[in-house]
């Protein structure tokens, strides 16, 4: 695994610290990273925000605002020049896949194609039984309110999540510009596994994961190997889990470490742990 942090955030996330991007980059240099992708949450579509029925804070503080986009791009460009002798900086976004808003997302990516080197496509919101796009990683209480089956039938929620991830991958395969694409934190649905005492994935969901991985391989997508779950009190595992990560390696899918840092201290966290996971046999 290259010494690269491929999933990072900035002061524009609105749910992290206000530390400047330059501090993240200096920290990465001090940790021996050679490559760094800035992937702030892309602005969410206005039509999605207008119909969102979840917590106001989740609506307003999940992503960069549209009127900050130019400032974000200018800052990344400036620091790319300033750090060029110390760190290869790639310009990017973490893009939410939102069912029903694919055209809005496509228009944004087309508009930003000339500027963008890499994107992480992630599922943070998925449709519930009422058809509402609800956040899955905001709080355990919000997850349970939108998806009460997480308590009574968790495998059904897992299946709904992986179906949505599959849709995000199908969408990614339709993008025509040569931007490098990673699928973000593949097992984020387990963020609150200790809170809900979630079971391991059943056979049906493991098959869905295998299908996703095979499709990623065919499409030439990378996989975000995300350390954030190790820092979450109700999780304790990376995204994806160790066995899924090793399965991806066996299939020849490139894994890229992602700290998912929203504060400087988290940049580079647990890189060695994730690297060691990939050095273990597949069946461990």
Kindly give the residue locations of the regions a language model identified.
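Active-site-adjacent C-terminal substructures of enzyme catalytic domains
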Residues: 205, 209-261, 267
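Divalent metal-coordination and catalytic microenvironments
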Residues: 7, 28, 119, 185, ...
């Amino acid at each position: 695994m290259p010494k690269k942090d491929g999933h990072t955030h900035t002061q524009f996330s609105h749910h992290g610290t206000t530390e400047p991007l330059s501090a993240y980059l200096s920290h990465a240099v001090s940790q021996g990273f050679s490559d760094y992708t800035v992937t702030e949450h892309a602005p969410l579509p206005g039509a999605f925000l207008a119909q969102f029925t979840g917590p106001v804070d989740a609506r307003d503080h999940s992503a960069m605002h549209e009127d900050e986009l130019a400032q974000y791009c200018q800052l990344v460009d400036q620091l790319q020049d300033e750090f060029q002798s110390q760190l290869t900086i790639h310009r990017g976004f973490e893009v939410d896949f939102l069912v029903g808003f694919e055209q809005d997302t496509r228009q944004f990516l087309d508009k930003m194609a000339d500027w963008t080197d890499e994107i992480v496509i992630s599922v943070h919101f998925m449709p519930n039984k009422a058809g509402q796009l609800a956040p899955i990683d905001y709080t355990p209480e919000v997850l349970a309110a939108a998806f009460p089956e997480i308590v009574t039938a968790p495998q059904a929620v897992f299946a709904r999540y992986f179906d949505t991830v599959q849709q995000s991958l199908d969408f990614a395969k339709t993008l025509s510009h040569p931007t490098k694409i990673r699928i973000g934190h593949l097992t984020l649905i387990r963020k609150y596994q200790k809170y809900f005492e979630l079971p391991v994935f059943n056979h049906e969901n493991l098959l869905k994961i295998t299908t996703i991985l095979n499709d990623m391989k065919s499409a030439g997508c990378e996989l975000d190997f995300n350390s954030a779950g190790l820092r979450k009190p109700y999780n304790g595992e990376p995204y994806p889990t160790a066995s899924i990560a090793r399965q991806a390696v066996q299939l020849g899918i490139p894994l890229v470490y992602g700290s998912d840092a929203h504060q400087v201290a988290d940049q580079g966290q647990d890189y060695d742990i994730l690297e060691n996971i990939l050095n273990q046999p597949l069946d461990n």
